[in-house]
C-alpha cells in the first residue's frame, strides 16, 4: 500500500502478522513457526544484500513447539569432513576448512561466524569475541589445531582472496574479497559433506550441535557448555544431556576431542 518498501516493515508489523495467523486464521503453532522461519530467512537475505539497513526479525519470537533432539555428527564424521576440505589444496578450500574447523571448535552460530572481523580474534590468547543473540558479547576459545589453521589462513589464503581489497576487515571473504554470507557457508557445508560421503543435509548448526554434544560426552559441565554456546537459559542447553554420560571437567582443552 502507498509508499510500502521492505524497509518500512518493523517488529510491530511482524508481530501483528503473527497474531493474525494465530488468532484470526487459526493456524497451529507448528504452521506459524514454519512461517516465522521463512520470514526470518527472507529478511536475513534482504539484510545481507544491503536491501534493508537492519533485520527486523532479530527479535521476532516464534511459537514454542515440541523440541526435537539436536542432529549431530560423530567425531569420526567430523574428522572426515574436515580432512576432505583440507585436502582440496585451493585458497577457497583452505578457507572452507578453517570455517568448518571454527564452527566445530567454538560452537559459533553461522550468523556470528560471518559477522567476525579481524579485530575479534585474539591470537595470543587463543580466543574470539563474538556478538550473539540479543547483542550479547561472549568469548569462545580456540584449541591449538584450530588456531594454527586460522593463522595459516590469515597468512596465505585470505590475502590471496582479498586481491586489491586489502582494507576489508571481514575475517572470512569470498573470491572477490567480500564478506561471506550465511547462505555461502550453508553451501560450503553441503558441498564438502557430499564429497566426504556423509549426510549431505547437514547445516552449520549441525556442527554447533556436534560441538556441544561432544564436549558433554567428554566430560564438560553443562554450565560450561551453556556459556560457550551463549544460551541465556540452561534449559536450552539441557536438550543435549540425553546423549551425555561423562565426568565433569573444567578445562575446555581437556574436553574437546580435537584439542
State where each predicted segment sits:
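Conserved catalytic core of the tyrosine transesterase superfamily
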Residues: 1-259
Amino acid at each position: 500500500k502507498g509508499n510500502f518498501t521492505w524497509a518500512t516493515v518493523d517488529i510491530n508489523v511482524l508481530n501483528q502478522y503473527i497474531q493474525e495467523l494465530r488468532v484470526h486464521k487459526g493456524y497451529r503453532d507448528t504452521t506459524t513457526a514454519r512461517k516465522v522461519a521463512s520470514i526470518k530467512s527472507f529478511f536475513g537475505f534482504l539484510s545481507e544484500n544491503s536491501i534493508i539497513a537492519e533485520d527486523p526479525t532479530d527479535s521476532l519470537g516464534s511459537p514454542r513447539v515440541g523440541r526435537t533432539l539436536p542432529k549431530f555428527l560423530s567425531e569420526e564424521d567430523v574428522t572426515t569432513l574436515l580432512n576432505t576440505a583440507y585436502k582440496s589444496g585451493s585458497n577457497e578450500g583452505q578457507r572452507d576448512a578453517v570455517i568448518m574447523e571454527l564452527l566445530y571448535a567454538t560452537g559459533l552460530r553461522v550468523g556470528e561466524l560471518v559477522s567476525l572481523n579481524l579485530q575479534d580474534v585474539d591470537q595470543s590468547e587463543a580466543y574470539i569475541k563474538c556478538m550473539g543473540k540479543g547483542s550479547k558479547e561472549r568469548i569462545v576459545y580456540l584449541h591449538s589445531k584450530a588456531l594454527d589453521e586460522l593463522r595459516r589462513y590469515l597468512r596465505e589464503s585470505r590475502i590471496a582472496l582479498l586481491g586489491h581489497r586489502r582494507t576489508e576487515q571481514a575475517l572470512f571473504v569470498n573470491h572477490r574479497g567480500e564478506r561471506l554470507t550465511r547462505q555461502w557457508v550453508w553451501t560450503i557445508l553441503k558441498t564438502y559433506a557430499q564429497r566426504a560421503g556423509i549426510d549431505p543435509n547437514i547445516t552449520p548448526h549441525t556442527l554447533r550441535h556436534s560441538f556441544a554434544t561432544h564436549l558433554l560426552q567428554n566430560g564438560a559441565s553443562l554450565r560450561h557448555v551453556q556459556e560457550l554456546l551463549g544460551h541465556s537459559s540452561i534449559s536450552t542447553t539441557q536438550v543435549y544431556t540425553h546423549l551425555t554420560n561423562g565426568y565433569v571437567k573444567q578445562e575446555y582443552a581437556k574436553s574437546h576431542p580435537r584439542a
